[in-house]
Amino acid sequence: AAALKERGFAITGSDQGIYPPMSTFLEARGIEARPFDVANLAYKPDLVVIGNAISRGNPEAEYALEHKLAYCALPELLKHQFLRGKHSLVVCGTHGKTTTASLLAWLLEHNGLNPSFLIGGIPNNLGQGARFTDSEWCVLEGDEYDTAFFDKRSKFVHYLPEAVVINNLEFDHADIFGSLAEIQTSFQRLINIIPRNGLLLAN
């Protein structure tokens, strides 16, 4: 949301509750988050971005579907707005994604590459969890969780990976994966889209 606002988009958001540090971060950037209500979409926005925590029955999701509003999931938006033409470095695995992605972004930053990054936390040494620059380098924390109720692929398959770091794999997310083998299949789909000139680092 903050990165899109910096690009000149008008942004509004809805959630059940946002708490520090994220609420503080959004408030400092003038981004208002409201409780879910169909009135939030009455002005017919150009695009509705539906998060993966949203399921059928959510009033705003139902409104978007019923009124044929353009919608997409966040990973798809990232791909089209921020990742095309970049060297996407995707850090994934069951544990250690945030730490490893933060370290990788910091290394690129301190080597003068001014990377874009999207990390599932706010690293102390970077001051924010997301930043999109004109640099050709982008570090993404890649999550194997599903993209949205209308797209059950793992989020990381949208990230146009050029290099992938897999920290580790264990059985996780029992709400969407039935076994470790299913998780491994999801990671194999990510590996399958690394280009021939790309890189895979697997622990």
Locations of the language-model features?
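Short, polar loop motifs at secondary-structure junctions
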Residues: Q16-Y19, D37-A39, N52-R56, E76
